[in-house]
């Protein structure tokens, strides 16, 4: 069955980039999009990335959507095993490109490459230092 949006506003409230506005969606401020975007980012884009600790993707809207509550766990083992919930920034940054490919080459984020992910780590770290809170 097709599930229509309930217009509860949860996604609008939680979105780090405020990309939802009624029925409109602005992908250019979506954190998931920005974590994959190549090149330098504007200060505003950097701040959006730094709002959550994820270096790739976001899915905050999916997390709060009522349609995603109480759904059954997938029967596909590949989606339930070998999960990665944390990456140590320092260890990640010290990997050579070859080590990165060997360690993370089969992960969904690996196609974007190490440099973009390190850039995202940096934005998150910079925004969440004691100095940035002043």
Task: Name every feature range the model reports, one short phrase each.
Residues 1-13:
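Glycine-rich adenosyl-nucleotide cofactor-binding module
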Residues 102-103, 110-128:
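Long, compositionally biased charged/polar accessory segments in the mid-to-C-terminal portions
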Residues 38-56, 87-110:
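Short Fe-S-cluster ligation motifs
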Residues 10-32, 51-56, 60-79:
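Iron-sulfur cluster-binding cysteine motifs and their immediate structural context
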Residues 69, 75-91, 106:
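Extended alpha-helical surfaces
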Residues 131-134:
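C-terminal, charged low-complexity interaction regions
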Residues 26, 84-88, 96, 117:
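Alpha-helical structural motif
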């Amino acid at each position: 069955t097709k599930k229509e949006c309930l217009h509860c506003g949860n996604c609008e409230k939680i979105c780090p980039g405020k990309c939802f506005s009624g029925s409109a969606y602005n992908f250019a401020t979506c954190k998931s999009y920005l974590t994959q975007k190549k090149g330098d980012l504007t200060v505003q884009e950097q701040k959006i990335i730094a709002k959550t600790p994820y270096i790739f993707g976001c899915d905050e809207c999916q997390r709060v959507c009522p349609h995603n509550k109480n759904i059954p766990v997938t029967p596909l083992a590949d989606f339930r095993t070998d999960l990665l919930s944390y990456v140590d920034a320092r260890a990640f940054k010290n990997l050579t490109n070859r080590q990165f490919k060997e360690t993370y080459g089969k992960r969904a984020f690996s196609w974007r490459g190490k440099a973009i992910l390190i850039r995202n780590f940096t934005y998150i770290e910079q925004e969440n230092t004691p100095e940035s809170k002043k």
